[in-house]
């Protein structure tokens, strides 16, 4: 969360194995809602990362509690470590994310809106129209029709499915296509 510093390695590995890796970040907003932010290039992602670094509390990570926060190269070798705790909320508002990410040649959409934690719907009860999202992410097992009943604002949005996996071995093998 709140970093793109491992995207250069991920993109290199993807290129070597013929897998498309889209540079991105799962941002934690001021409202403690997670938003997926995807970028055209690694450079755009890293520029956004720099912006986010200036908007995250300077709380030191405690690896014994929260785990290590390493930056790795394409060979899984440690090349750096992030000292600030990354799981905290930034001071970036959910209503500002879409326009902000666009400035960095990216797109953004609220993550796992069907979940009871760290989703915009859990935090605010709905997706605010001021946020101007045109898509939203549902978890793999979510009932899209039920979610649309609970959150009518989803009717006008493209719904994407994702596992919210944070480790490769937890990613499903299903393939999805998004026309860009």
Describe these PLM feature segments.
Residues 4-46, 99, 104-107, 114-180:
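Charged catalytic cores and adjacent phosphate/nucleic-acid-binding surfaces used
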Residues 38-83, 126:
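Active-site gating loops and adjacent loop-to-helix segments of metal-dependent hydrolytic enzymes
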Residues 59-68, 88-95, 112-118, 133:
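Short low-complexity stretches enriched in small and charged residues
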Residues 76-78, 82-114:
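Internal catalytic-core helix/loop-beta-alpha segment
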């Amino acid at each position: 969360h709140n970093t793109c510093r491992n995207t250069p390695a991920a993109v290199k590995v993807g290129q070597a194995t013929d897998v498309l890796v889209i540079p991105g970040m799962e941002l934690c907003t001021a409202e403690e809602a997670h938003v997926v932010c995807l970028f055209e290039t690694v450079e755009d992602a890293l520029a956004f990362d720099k912006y986010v670094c200036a908007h995250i509390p300077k709380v030191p990570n405690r690896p014994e509690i929260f785990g290590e926060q390493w930056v790795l190269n394409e060979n899984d070798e440690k090349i750096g470590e992030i000292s600030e705790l990354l799981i905290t909320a930034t001071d970036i508002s959910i209503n500002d994310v879409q326009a902000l990410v666009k400035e960095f040649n990216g797109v953004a959409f609220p993550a796992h809106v069907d979940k009871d934690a760290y989703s915009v719907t859990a935090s605010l009860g709905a997706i605010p129209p001021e946020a101007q999202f045109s898509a939203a992410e549902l978890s793999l097992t979510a009932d899209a029709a039920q979610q649309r009943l609970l959150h009518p604002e989803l009717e006008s949005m493209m719904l994407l499915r994702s596992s919210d996996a944070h480790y490769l071995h937890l990613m499903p093998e299903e393939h999805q296509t998004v026309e860009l």
